[in-house]
């Protein structure tokens, strides 16, 4: 269905942005716990991107590159670019890329929570679309994305709370 295609295509770009964010953890001096989380996100989402790209290829459908791209929407016959749910703006991405140490940890967790909530919205949109999400592979992928994101949001909220309650390091 169109809903399945939109989900698979959109989630490739969505996951690609999360991977870009996660790859900054080590060079930007993230804490060990944030680095571990970032590595987990990268591994899981790279595998899911490959699965989604193969699903589209198998159906001879256009396969988007695995890079963060805005979604094109037609409104009133005019193309509009907009970010998919939870996607970070260019300004947010620049802010995260420039952050270091504890500031990076705080921004990474805050923005990745926003990003993951957007993925949940995309799953809800898929399952709310007539006839979409019925195929076994798509149902399982979307269900896995939902479960993983809910679990990771809870983990990141705990990590953010711990970061906020910990005393900043002495200068």
State what each model feature region is.
Residues 1-171:
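All-alpha RGS (Regulator of G-protein Signaling) helical domain and cognate RGS-like helical scaffolds
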């Amino acid at each position: 269905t169109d809903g399945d295609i939109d989900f698979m295509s959109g989630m490739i770009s969505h996951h690609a942005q999360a991977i870009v964010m996660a790859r900054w953890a080590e060079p930007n001096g993230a804490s060990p716990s944030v680095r571990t989380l970032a590595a987990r996100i990268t591994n899981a989402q790279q595998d899911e991107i490959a699965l989604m790209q193969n699903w589209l290829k198998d159906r001879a459908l256009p396969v988007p590159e695995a890079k963060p791209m805005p979604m094109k929407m037609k409104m009133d016959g005019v193309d509009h670019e907009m970010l998919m749910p939870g996607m970070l703006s260019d300004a947010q991405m620049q802010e995260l890329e420039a952050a270091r140490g504890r500031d990076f940890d705080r921004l990474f967790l805050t923005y990745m929570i926003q990003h993951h909530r957007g993925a949940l919205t995309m799953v809800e949109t898929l399952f709310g679309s007539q006839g979409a999400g019925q195929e076994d592979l798509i149902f399982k992928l979307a269900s896995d994305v939902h479960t993983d994101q809910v679990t990771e949001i809870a983990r990141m909220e705990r990590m953010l709370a711990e970061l906020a309650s910990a005393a900043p390091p002495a200068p």
